[in-house]
Regions:
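P-loop NTPase catalytic core of nucleic-acid-dependent motor ATPases
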Residues: 8-114, 267-272, 276
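AAA+/SF3 P-loop NTPase mechanochemical coupling elements
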Residues: 109-114, 149-167
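Conserved AAA+/SF3 P-loop NTPase catalytic/coupling segment centered on the Walker-B
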Residues: 117-140, 174-180
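Structural recognition of the conserved hydrophobic beta-strand(s) that form the central parallel beta-sheet
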Residues: 119-122, 148, 161-169, 186-187
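Conserved catalytic/switch belt of AAA+ P-loop NTPases
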Residues: 133-156
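A short helix-turn-beta junction within AAA+ P-loop NTPase domains corresponding to the substrate/partner-engaging
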Residues: 174-195
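Long, low-complexity, charged/polar intrinsically disordered regions in eukaryotic proteins
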Residues: 204-241
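DNA transaction DNA-binding modules
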Residues: 227-282
Length: 282
């Protein structure tokens, strides 16, 4: 048994790393325009930074399993736009993609993650509530799983080599939460604005995506990146996420007040008077 393990270790290879290492970028920028091209998203700095961060997270997880990366790229809106197809083609090999992660309390959830690089959480995001969002946030924060596979005698730590994408046809999928929604990076899709549908010519779409990975690899090799948003982009994200939360006028007033509040503590009476504009004796 030990001899087999030694021989297997000596002959190990990583197909995803091999794929990424074999890419040569042609120098043409694609990350900035990809989501607009296939899904009609805005080709702005936010969309560029969101997709770039997701790609670099996926690359980092392949080369440095278990590295800290908590971000989920969430594609929102546009039923039939090709959101799930985008994640599938992004994984390059269909075997490296799965959308079979339906429940986080499934005892087989970790086995379903094995061998996959891009994992789409579609139903969980679409039906999320405050409680399930907390579970997803906790799940995204993990850097490893500990479990036993068949024929193993003891559980082992398995560092994550995957990233998670989300998709939702519902706009207000994020609960009102000032503290933890930073993990969710929503990008609105507008299929009627897309240059092409991603499945119109799958061969061309795959070639485009391959070169986008090559561009991301050029950034990765440069070392000039971080696996998180800049402070400026984080502020933009916080404001942008409001568009994907349930409409609640009073909650919005309170959130706006708290965002500009500079004190160390706040009480309910203060919110009642200053955020909502009431008098104490009303």
């Amino acid at each position: 048994e030990d001899a087999v393990a030694v021989i297997a270790n000596e002959n190990r290879y990583h197909p995803i790393c091999d794929f990424l290492n074999g890419l040569e970028w042609d120098g043409q920028e694609r990350i900035r325009f990809c989501l607009h091209r296939f899904l009609g998203s805005d080709a702005d700095d936010y969309t560029y930074e969101a997709l770039k961060l997701f790609l670099l997270g996926a690359i980092s997880r392949a080369f440095k399993p278990g590295c800290k990366f908590e971000v989920m790229l969430c594609l929102v809106g546009g039923q039939g736009a090709g959101k799930s197809s985008f994640f599938r083609l992004l994984a390059i090999n269909d075997d490296w993609f799965t959308d079979d992660l339906k429940k986080l309390d499934d005892e087989n959830v970790y086995r379903k993650m094995q061998g996959h690089w891009i994992i789409e959480m579609s139903e969980m995001i679409a039906t999320a509530n405050a409680k399930s969002i907390e579970e997803i946030k906790s799940f995204l924060s993990r850097q490893k799983e500990t479990y036993k596979i068949p024929y193993e005698t003891h559980p082992a730590d398995r560092r994550r080599q995957c990233v998670f994408g989300g998709s939702s046809n519902t706009l207000d999928f994020l609960p009102l939460d000032r503290t933890g929604n930073r993990r969710f990076v929503p990008v609105m899709v507008y299929p009627d604005r897309a240059e092409v549908h991603i499945l119109d010519n799958e061969e061309e779409s795959r070639a485009y995506i391959n070169q986008m990975w090559a561009e991301a690899m050029a950034i990765y090799r440069s070392g000039d990146f971080k696996l998180r948003f800049s402070p400026t982009m984080n502020e933009y994200l916080k404001a942008h996420q409001r568009e994907f939360m349930p409409e609640d006028t009073k909650a919005g007033q309170i959130l706006d007040y708290l965002d500009s509040y500079t004190g160390n503590a706040v009480c309910s009476k203060q919110l009642y008077r200053e955020a909502l504009g009431h008098e104490y004796d009303e």
